[in-house]
Every structure is written in structure tokens, then in C-alpha cells.
Amino acid sequence: MFALFFDYATTTNDLDATTLKSFAIIIPCVALIVMYVLFGWFWSIAIGLQTKVPNTVKMKVKKFKVFFFIPFIYILSLLVFMALFGLSDFEAEPDLNSAFPFGLLTIMLPLHFLSIFGIFYSLYFVAKTYKTVELQREVSFSDFAGEFFMIWFYFIGVWIIQPKINEMVEDTPMEAQYV
């Protein structure tokens, strides 16, 4: 997404304010679509498979929901801020002596790290839920480390994990579907 903007910006000599403003709308909108799909997939696995978790295993669903919505709200507000900032007529040479950049950094940096932690906890919880349902027992990180990385690199992992999730939900073995 950003590569498209960079490619356009470097190959075009007539990059005007209207083009920049249109990219200020397009890039956050595309990022929102990707975010909704990815976070929706996380939510559907983590919450949707809770009915298949054995009664002997206690999953911390409330903790997941808190850490799920922290990055969700942070990314959403960041994209809205970027779109509004991109639409405004900001100065070409901002005053770096003002308190705004420092104040923004002191607010954004801790929120960014909290958001990163929330995303990793969501990945952890989704992978743990998936493996708990698959094995029908309490699992440790070593049991679901592979699933954790497949969910993290979702563009590859979705092709491996999603068919198994579909099988878990349907309660029919995958081999039986092709006989």
C-alpha cells in the first residue's frame, strides 16, 4: 500500500496537494479494511471456538477481549488522525521547537507499545485456543508455537489453519470430505 504511494510519488513529477490528500484518504481506508478482516479472523477463532474448549480448561476470555480492543481502538484512532492530518493544510516546514511533536511522541510511544503487546497477546490467545480445541487438553506454548507463527504470518498461515478450523467447527474429518 505504501509502496504504491512511494512508486507514484517517485515516478510522477506533478505531485500536487490534491493527489496527496486523496492518498491521505485511500491509504487509511485500505488499512482499515485489512485491519477489520484480520482482527475479525482473530475474533472469530478466539471467541467462536470457545464452545469447543473442554470444560477442564479455563481460558481467560475477558483478558483477551481487553487486549484485543486496545490495538483495535489504537489503530483505528491512529488512521483517523492520519487521515485528518493528511487532509489539513499543514506547513511544509513545521516548527520543530514547538511542544506538539514531543507531546505527541510521549503519548504515542507508550500507546504504541501497549498496542503491540495487545496484538501479540491476541496472537497468543488465538493460537492457544486453536490448539486447545485440537488437542482437547491444557496446552503450553511449546504445543502451539507453530500455530502462533502461522497466525502471525497470516498470509501463509490462513491457508493451513483455516481448513482445520472449518473441520473443527463442522466435526467432520477432512479426509471424509474427499472420499
Feature map (PLM): residue ranges:
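Feature detects long, helix-prone N-terminal segments enriched in hydrophobes
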Residues: 75-79, 104-148, 161
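Membrane-interface helix-boundary motifs at transmembrane edges
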Residues: 13-20, 51-63, 134-138
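Membrane-water interface of transmembrane alpha-helices
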Residues: 36-51, 122-128, 161-162
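Alpha-helical transmembrane segments with an aromatic anchor "belt"
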Residues: 45-75
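Low-complexity, intrinsically disordered extramembrane tails and loops of integral membrane proteins
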Residues: 13-18, 167-179
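Membrane-helix interface segments in multi-pass membrane proteins
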Residues: 2-35, 75-117
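Cytoplasmic membrane-interface regions of multi-pass membrane proteins
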Residues: 45-57, 127-136, 167-173
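Hydrophobic, aromatic-rich membrane-embedded alpha-helical segments
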Residues: 35-36, 143-164
